[in-house]
From Swiss-Prot:
It is found in: Cytoplasm. The lineage of its organism: Bacteria, Pseudomonadati, Thermodesulfobacteriota, Desulfovibrionia, Desulfovibrionales. It holds the Pfam family Leu_Phe_trans. HAMAP family: Leu_Phe_trans. The gene is aat. It catalyses: N-terminal L-lysyl-[protein] + L-leucyl-tRNA(Leu) = N-terminal L-leucyl-L-lysyl-[protein] + tRNA(Leu) + H(+); N-terminal L-arginyl-[protein] + L-leucyl-tRNA(Leu) = N-terminal L-leucyl-L-arginyl-[protein] + tRNA(Leu) + H(+); L-phenylalanyl-tRNA(Phe) + an N-terminal L-alpha-aminoacyl-[protein] = an N-terminal L-phenylalanyl-L-alpha-aminoacyl-[protein] + tRNA(Phe). This is Leucyl/phenylalanyl-tRNA--protein transferase. GO terms for cellular component: cytoplasm. One of its GO terms (biological process) is protein catabolic process. It comes from Nitratidesulfovibrio vulgaris (strain ATCC 29579 / DSM 644 / CCUG 34227 / NCIMB 8303 / VKM B-1760 / Hildenborough) (Desulfovibrio vulgaris).
């Protein structure tokens, strides 16, 4: 397997077809906003653990939720309709990152959200490209997720919950909002049973790249996101 070393002075990536069987494509570079946005445009994302160099991935197949195939399980929709949680956008981005980083993940000895990753996504948030969706209960943040928006694609990064269904409710609000805004898909990156229940599929990389190309031709919704006053996700 060939592993590419990225230069520090140019935001370039090798062709994703050069990725290894596990999706690993390249090593090194940096986490500047320019490089991160270029990576997402090309179907690549960073993922590495404490003490590791920056690793860049483009798995094949790719877990993707086409938003026209969104399915909300009936029991979960009852929870959404019950309004147990107040859902907000972009009001506690740093707190969502902190909680995602603190959440234990099966098979991982430590968090992949190392401090430099949190700083990088915080910069993207301040530039209006990264967003948080938060579930609140009694004035307390109890669940949420964050990701990057580019054109008509949303690239989900991580989620957490401190109460049952909190992150799932936040995701339903996000997905329905993205549909109303004309987004095409949510990139789930890694396959999970949780996302498959929402209608996600394992998409061949070539098909994902075609969807990505079409989606990134749409204008990006840059800036702080707010829920439309009359929006409901049902």
């Amino acid at each position: 397997m060939r592993l590419y070393l990225l230069p520090d002075d140019a935001c370039i990536f090798p062709d994703v077809g050069e990725a290894g069987p596990d999706g690993l494509l390249a090593i090194g570079g940096d986490l500047t906003p320019e490089r991160l946005l270029r990576a997402y445009e090309e179907g690549i994302f960073p993922w590495y653990g404490p003490g590791d160099p920056i690793l860049w991935w483009s798995p094949d197949p790719r877990c993707v939720l086409p938003l026209d195939a969104l399915h909300v399980p009936r029991r979960l929709m009852r929870t959404v309709r019950a309004k147990t949680f107040e859902v907000r956008l972009d009001t506690a981005f740093a707190d969502v990152l902190e909680q995602c980083a603190a959440t234990p993940r099966p098979g991982q000895g430590g968090t992949w959200l190392v401090p430099e990753m949190r700083a990088a996504y915080t910069r993207l948030h301040h530039l209006g490209h990264a967003h948080s969706v938060e579930a609140w209960y009694g004035g307390r943040l109890v669940g949420g997720l964050y990701g990057v928006a580019l054109g008509g694609g949303f690239f989900g990064e991580s989620m957490f919950h401190a109460m049952p269904d909190a992150s799932k409710v936040a995701f339903v609000w996000l997905a329905r909002l993205l549909v109303s805004w004309g987004f095409r898909f949510v990139d789930c990156q890694q396959t999970t049973s949780h996302m498959l229940r929402f209608g996600a599929v394992e998409m061949p990389r070539t098909d994902f790249l075609a969807c990505l190309h079409d989606a990134t031709r749409q204008p990006s919704r840059i800036g702080r996101w707010r829920l439309p006053q009359d929006f409901v996700p049902w």
